[in-house]
Amino acid sequence: IEYMHTHNKCLVNQRELGADTQSFGNALRGALRQDPDVILVGEMRDKETIEIALRAAETGHLVLSTLHTVGAVNTMDRIIDVFPAEQQEQIRVQLSAVMEGVVSQQLMRTATGKGRVAAFEIMLGTPAIRNLIREGKTHQLLTPIQTGAQLGMITMDTSLMGLYRRNVIDQRTLLSYS
């Protein structure tokens, strides 16, 4: 367990791999038996974990997770590509129905070299986004992200350019991350 949550205004039940459970899948199944409102999966690393997380989201649970990807498009593709080709259409349908949003971040050195700053990509589950995922057109997701700025969406490149224009990162960093 990386961080021990304390019980303030809610109950937090944590499971540690190896000590409390043998796999993310077992931990998720156990969590679902306790009727949680929110489930935080440290990382969706395998097919079993993703399947159970999707099922949990379909039954009304808010599921939050991490994935080591850069950008919303890569995140969607990584989730879908974990499954064999014959299951991918079903997964796209499930994912399009339950995905509320993706926040992708990249940490980079500041222009001063003192500290780091995050550039973000934010994609929300709008009808256009959901349709593209369902239809297997994830390569087209950047267009509705770009046009969805008024909803709070932003592409990684736009975020990087904003950091550059405010002199938070230098040109070399901008080019290496865009």
Residue map of PLM features:
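Short, flexible helix-loop junctions that flank or precede catalytic/ligand sites
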Residues: 1-178
